Structures are given as structure tokens and as C-alpha cells.
């Protein structure tokens, strides 16, 4: 039987209850078989093109970098059906679940984007859907909760722990351990137990593949850097995957610094965590001195995650990718700037990557550089959050 690598360097693995090992083995084999099946690939690509709207545009910003010599392109995953990059890999996994004969889908969601993507894929493909969501996130992402319900999903609020994404992940895994014969756990990021990090990367890698083709067609060369926000890391690994071998291209991941990287209110485990076991994998993790998982924090629900995907941990360890961070305030500023200068309202998650690109442009205004930001989602879901913050600050 063919097998995928379970580890990226020292990170990854499969730290799960014994009861889930057969389910994960079945999933790995089904994925390998599907990848080798031209019919599966063709059905996946057809859905991406005709239902989701791929390829997405690569947009050159006209006004944002005025006064600098930076050319900044945006990879427009915000234009994808469902409003974010999440739709790509959800369609892939839902097709895989059907191929495996599963009738139900279990998912977890933070910002609600993965939940919405899962709900739409289940509606399309005739699968039952239940989504676990931290009770706090249910409150701060009410439009997405209603979208999920409209599409027939059952949304289950999780009140344990910090009532956020990590708690939803735990509950979803618990559910799956009792229902895996009929249900597929559709994990929402490039993290968790093997083979999920690999499956999610492969079902997101068209982001980077399209970007490479588009930038070569437009500019005749590769970008100096590709930049993406990192929570669990699926949009970033989707952008990075096709550029890893291109050593001239810097890969820059941006973690949430929250209220400040020197406070205890951030979500930057890559730079400020310790290696531990969480969510079925070995990875950098925000922990207290007793090894307990610390609460992460970010203004954006989708980055509010105390760990990170194992391939990002490995790319960081070997120095192939670099990871920086951006505060809530910087992300909010970038969110407003893009709206005002280009007429595009980005997700707060994506605004972190955008803020970093703007920092790069403005710190070296005379430097000619070609940058691509993965604009991983649109900001409709965040307008109430941003409105409340700006109102509190007296800006509006």
C-alpha cells in the first residue's frame, strides 16, 4: 500500500485515540487512490471552475502602494464562491467522502468561513452536515451561522474551554471517534493528524499554481515574495506549495500579534510557542509554564488558533519560509486602506498579510519589488466587528 509521509521534519504525526487510526488509514488510502484517478481529478476541477469560479483573478493594486516602487498584486480568493479560499479544499474533501461511501460530514469552524464552505459543499453533493463552532464565535460571526443554517447545516455551539476554535476542534474529533463509519471529518485547515495536513495542502495548491502562471504572464518573472496570513495555515500552504522549490521567491507567513506580541493576547505559536501535542499532531503550540494550552487571541476569528500546521513549522525550522506578525491595529488599518484605495473589502485574516506587504513597501519606498498577497477571503463577515471597534475608537 502506498503511503504519504506522516511528518514534516519533526512535526506532524498522528496523535489520536486508537479508535481513529483505522479511519485515518482509510482516509489516506482513499486520498492516494483518488489522486491517481483521472475521473476524480476531472470532477474536482469541473466543480472548481463551474461552481466555485476558478481560476480567481490576480489583481494589480492601482493606488495602495503609491509613493513606493513596489508592485503589489492580490490573489483574489475573496472572489471564490463562498467568499474565501476554504471552498477549494472543502469540495475536494466532500468528493472524497462520497467516494468513500460516507453520508455525513462533521466540521469545525472559527470565523464561520469553513463552516459555510462545508455547508455549501454538502448541499451541492447531498451530504448531511453538522458544524461545531465555539459559542464566542457563534456570537461574533452571526451572518455566517445563518448562512450555514440556510444551507441545511446543523450548527452546534461549543461552550467548553475558551468557547473558540480549539474547543470546536476537540468536540468535532470527539464526535468523529464515535461516528467515523458513516461520517467524514472535514477538517478545515492544514493541521491536525496525518493525513489531513497533506490532503488540505494538495486541495489548496491551485492557489499557488494559478498565481505562478498569472504572474509570469503579466510580469514575465516570478514575484520577489508571496505573503499570506497564518492561523492553521491552509491558505498560506496553498500559496506556498508551488513556490517552495523556487528559491528566489521569499515565502512570508503572517501570524496575528493581537494586542501585541509581548502581551499574552496574540496567536503566534510559530514564533512564541513551544513544541507540543495538540489536535492530533506535534507542532508549535502556545503553552503556559505547566504545558497547558494557552488561549490564543486575534481580532479575526479565523486566526484565533493556538497552534499551526506542521509543514509551516518545518518550513520555519529549515529557514525556507519566514514568519512575522501583525497586530490587530495594523490589520484594521490595512482593512480600511484597501477598502478606501481599491474598493475591495478584505477579510480581517487577509488584512494581516496585506498589512505586512504594506510595511515592506513603505519601509523601502525606493526598492523595486514585486509582491503577491493571498487575499484569502472577503470582509463581509467582519463589517460588524470592524464597525464596533471603529465606533469605540471614535473614528466613525
Curated annotation (Swiss-Prot):
Disulfide partners: none
Modified residues (N6-(pyridoxal phosphate)lysine): 86
Cofactor(s) recorded in Swiss-Prot or TrEMBL: pyridoxal 5'-phosphate
Top-rank taxon, per record: Bacteria
PROSITE patterns: TRP_SYNTHASE_BETA
Pathway: Amino-acid biosynthesis; L-tryptophan biosynthesis; L-tryptophan from chorismate: step 5/5
CC annotations in GO: cytoplasm
Transmembrane intervals: none
EC numbers on record: 4.2.1.20
GO molecular function: tryptophan synthase activity
InterPro entries for this protein: Trp_synth_b_CS (IPR006653), Trp_synth_beta (IPR006654), Trp_synth_beta/beta-like (IPR023026), TrpB-like_PALP (IPR001926), TrpB-like_PALP_sf (IPR036052)
Sorted UniProt keywords: Amino-acid biosynthesis, Aromatic amino acid biosynthesis, Lyase, Pyridoxal phosphate, Tryptophan biosynthesis
Catalytic activity: (1S,2R)-1-C-(indol-3-yl)glycerol 3-phosphate + L-serine = D-glyceraldehyde 3-phosphate + L-tryptophan + H2O
Stored NCBIfam families: trpB (TIGR00263)
Purpose: The beta subunit is responsible for the synthesis of L-tryptophan from indole and L-serine.
Subunit record text: Tetramer of two alpha and two beta chains.
Record-stated family: Belongs to the TrpB family.
Protein name: Tryptophan synthase beta chain 1
Lineage, opening ranks: Bacteria, Pseudomonadati, Pseudomonadota, Gammaproteobacteria, Vibrionales
